[in-house]
């Protein structure tokens, strides 16, 4: 059995994620209260405005303990939370270029440096290979705080490499989508990633391997029009906003007010766009069970 050592403690793949130390996250033990205290930094829930300690919200997988609102997770934190054990990170050799010498209110390279400084990531997609409930798989997650999780050439490169590795090692690929769409600063090159990622997904299907998409808040544009809607199974987190054009753009076009829950996960479930809505606390076991069924694993 594979084991990993963190903070001087030996952990097996079956160790509950609440007992593991996630890089960059201070994990609370079960005795710690989920209520805010005066001695710890707090986060205000955007839904119920409750103040929750950073320790408590991390312990609760970034779900508000007061109202159950699903807060946004950073890509790296999500993948480390998702896997029992991370074996490798993929795609770090890819780095963004500026072939168009694109300048809007500031040069593209400057925007990239700002995004890297803000998130600590080199690009908007993080890819890891690991095990979940003793099943090896590959998972990728979009970092929405990196230029809105936009898809450029490096995101395409990393996704395609993840799919190719999954085919090579006969493993499932999981994608946690959270994106505003294609990256305008790369023009047609970013739009080409829609075709590249779609072709990579088709190769996975030809190989008989599962591709599962978890739609988190929000998913829009070219990512929705490609890799986010080509899964064998589509899972959404509660209340996630999912669409192609944004709600305001549609309202301005059709000159009508679109009432809630338009474009919410619940609306899409009612209209057959997603297969199920899964609470974040049940997500790991749900994905593990689906992968095991689709791959005929015990």
UniProtKB/Swiss-Prot annotation:
One of its GO terms (biological process) is malonyl-CoA biosynthetic process. This is Acetyl-coenzyme A carboxylase carboxyl transferase subunit beta. Keywords: ATP-binding, Cytoplasm, Fatty acid biosynthesis, Fatty acid metabolism, Lipid biosynthesis, Lipid metabolism, Metal-binding, Nucleotide-binding, Transferase, Zinc, Zinc-finger. Residues 41-298 form the CoA carboxyltransferase N-terminal domain. InterPro entries: AcCoA_carboxyl_beta, Acetyl_CoA_COase_Trfase_b_su, ClpP/crotonase-like_dom_sf, COA_CT_N. It catalyses: N(6)-carboxybiotinyl-L-lysyl-[protein] + acetyl-CoA = N(6)-biotinyl-L-lysyl-[protein] + malonyl-CoA. The keyword Zinc applies. HAMAP family: AcetylCoA_CT_beta (MF_01395). It is found in: Cytoplasm. PANTHER family: ACETYL-COENZYME A CARBOXYLASE CARBOXYL TRANSFERASE SUBUNIT BETA, CHLOROPLASTIC. Its EC number is 2.1.3.15. Acetyl-CoA carboxylase is a heterohexamer composed of biotin carboxyl carrier protein (AccB), biotin carboxylase (AccC) and two subunits each of ACCase subunit alpha (AccA) and ACCase subunit beta (AccD). Belongs to the AccD/PCCB family. Zn(2+) binds at residues 45, 48, 64, 67. Its cofactor is Zn(2+). GO terms for cellular component: acetate CoA-transferase complex. One of its GO terms (molecular function) is acetyl-CoA carboxylase activity.
């Amino acid at each position: 059995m594979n084991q990993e050592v963190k903070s001087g403690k030996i952990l097996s793949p079956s160790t509950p994620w609440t007992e593991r130390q996630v890089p960059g996250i201070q994990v609370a033990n079960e005795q710690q209260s989920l209520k805010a205290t005066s001695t710890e930094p707090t986060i205000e829930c955007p839904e119920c405005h409750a103040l929750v300690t950073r320790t408590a919200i991390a312990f609760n997988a970034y779900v508000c303990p007061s109202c159950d609102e699903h807060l946004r997770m950073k890509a790296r934190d999500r993948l480390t939370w998702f896997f029992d054990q991370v074996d490798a990170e993929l795609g770090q050799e890819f780095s963004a270029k500026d072939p168009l010498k694109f300048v809007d209110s500031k040069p593209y390279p400057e925007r990239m440096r700002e995004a890297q400084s803000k998130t600590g990531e080199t690009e908007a997609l993080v890819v890891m290979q690991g095990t979940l409930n003793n099943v090896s798989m590959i998972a990728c997650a979009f970092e929405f705080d990196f230029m809105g999780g936009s898809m450029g050439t490096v995101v395409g490169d990393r996704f395609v490499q993840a799919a190719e590795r999954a085919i090579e090692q006969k493993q499932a690929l999981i994608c946690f989508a959270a994106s505003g769409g294609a990256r305008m600063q790369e023009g047609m090159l970013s739009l080409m990633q829609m075709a590249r990622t779609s072709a990579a997904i088709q190769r996975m299907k030809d190989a008989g391997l599962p591709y599962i998409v978890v739609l988190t808040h929000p998913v829009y544009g070219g990512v929705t029009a490609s890799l986010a809607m080509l899964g064998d199974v589509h899972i959404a987190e509660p209340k996630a906003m999912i669409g192609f054009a944004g709600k305001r753009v549609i309202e301005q076009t059709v000159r009508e007010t679109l009432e809630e829950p338009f474009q919410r996960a619940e609306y899409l479930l009612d209209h057959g766009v997603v297969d199920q809505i899964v609470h974040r606390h049940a997500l790991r076991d749900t994905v593990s069970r689906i992968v095991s069924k689709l791959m005929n694993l015990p």
